[in-house]
């Protein structure tokens, strides 16, 4: 009952991920319909319900465009778990402020990069030019596409791909 279910808006735009229990509740109350069933059935004493994988809401839900949250995990994911100074994929990575906070650098997407411990120590509280270091890739906020937001579940749920791609 805790398996993820992709929730689509009435126009098939990917909205969210909920668990199976919530999805079945939405279907039974008539607020959603099942689009894909790839997981068998849930059996009760009297009835068997298909276990949904993708559901579509009956009415359009208007919401603002989502943004990727600025978290350590998302910075690592954006940078592909690679040090942005030396290109090394280390087991223990850190977050580095390109312009150090004590020099007025902000805690924003364009000022944060993944760094290995050695590069972070080497750069310290200096600017990149002072430490004679360069970024391999510019730090930018990742686009909040459906494939980026829901992509980590796509490998386990192949039937989601056709609904996620293109949004």
Model-derived features: positions:
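Short helix-coil boundary/hinge micro-motifs
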Residues: 1-67, 133-167
């Amino acid at each position: 009952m805790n398996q993820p279910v992709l929730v689509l808006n009435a126009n098939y735009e990917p909205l969210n991920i909920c668990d199976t229990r919530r999805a079945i509740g939405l279907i039974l109350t008539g607020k959603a319909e099942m689009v894909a069933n790839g997981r068998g059935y849930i059996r009760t004493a009297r009835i068997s319900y298909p276990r949904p994988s993708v559901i579509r809401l009956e009415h359009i839900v208007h919401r603002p465009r989502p943004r990727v949250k600025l978290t350590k995990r998302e910075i690592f994911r954006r940078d592909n778990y690679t040090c942005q100074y030396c290109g090394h994929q280390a087991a223990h990575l850190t977050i580095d402020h390109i312009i150090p906070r004590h020099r007025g650098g902000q805690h924003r997407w364009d000022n944060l990069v993944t760094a290995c411990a050695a590069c972070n120590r080497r750069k310290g509280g200096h600017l990149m030019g002072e430490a004679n270091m360069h970024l391999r890739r510019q730090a930018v906020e990742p686009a909040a596409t459906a494939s980026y937001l829901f992509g980590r579940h796509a490998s386990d749920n192949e039937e989601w791909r056709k609904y996620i791609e293109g949004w």
